[in-house]
A protein has these predicted regions:
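Short, small-residue-biased leader/transition segments that mark boundaries at the very start
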Residues: 1-4
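Short, solvent-exposed loop/turn segments at the edges of secondary structure
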Residues: 6-9, 95-97
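Conserved core segment of the aminotransferase class I/II
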Residues: 9-70, 114-119
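Well-ordered beta-strand positions enriched in small/hydrophobic/aromatic, beta-favoring residues
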Residues: 11-13, 75, 100, 135
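Beta-strand segments within the central parallel beta-sheet cores of soluble alpha/beta enzyme folds
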Residues: 24-28, 74-79, 158
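Short, well-ordered beta-strand elements within core beta-sheets of diverse protein domains
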Residues: 42-51, 98-106, 158-163
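Conserved small-domain helix->loop->beta segment predominantly found in fold-type I
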Residues: 61-120, 124-130, 143-149
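PLP-dependent enzyme catalytic core of the Aspartate aminotransferase-like
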Residues: 106-107, 118, 133-182
Length: 182
């Protein structure tokens, strides 16, 4: 159900008694505190985190391999051999995540929106580490001044988070939507 889609954030605060009184007042006014159900969901999710992260990695490697073969796409995923960040990734990391970027070359900007909007198994939005796959076309103004991207005037970024779905189904969905990239 929807219980898995909930976003939960937690933290702790270490303060002296004088400041704590102010924190209590602010907490009562705002209602910002973690309830027992939220704490339970966090604990339950942590129990399967390593298994889910392994599945994200396996699925994402398959998707990245598939997308790397497309002539109008540069996959921004350091796990892929031959990428400029692969050596650094190999030196410092043991695994990879479900997050990647696609640098897409286009003739018509609306083709990128059609690509993203035609995906059936991908939700639309920002997230990282959730169970569902997501896609998001990042507009130029959202990309900031990331000089390392070296985007030309006819390239945009689509951000993908690969979830826990069957990678064969995700590849089929991507394949059907890639026809819109012109």
């Amino acid at each position: 159900g929807d219980v898995y889609k909930r976003q939960v954030m937690g933290g702790s605060l270490a303060v002296n008694k004088r400041v704590f009184k102010h924190v209590q007042i602010a907490e009562k006014i705002s209602g910002l505190r973690m309830g027992p159900d939220d704490a339970y969901l966090i604990i339950r999710g942590l129990r399967t985190l390593d298994t889910r992260l392994d599945r994200h990695e396996i699925n994402t490697k398959k998707i990245a391999s598939f997308l790397s073969k497309h002539k109008k796409i540069t996959v921004l995923y350091p796990y892929n051999k031959g990428t400029k960040d692969y050596k650094m990734w190999k030196k410092y990391y043991k695994g990879s995540s479900g997050l990647m970027g696609l640098k897409i070359k286009y003739r018509n900007i609306s083709s990128i929106d059609r690509f993203v909007n035609s995906l059936r198994l991908f939700g639309y939005g920002y997230s990282w580490g959730g169970f569902e796959s997501l896609a998001l076309h990042q507009k130029i103004k959202e990309q900031g001044k990331r000089k390392y991207l070296n985007l030309s005037k006819d390239e945009h970024i689509v951000r993908l988070h690969i979830g826990l779905e069957d990678p064969k189904d995700l590849i089929k969905d991507l394949k059907n939507s890639l026809k819109f990239i012109r």
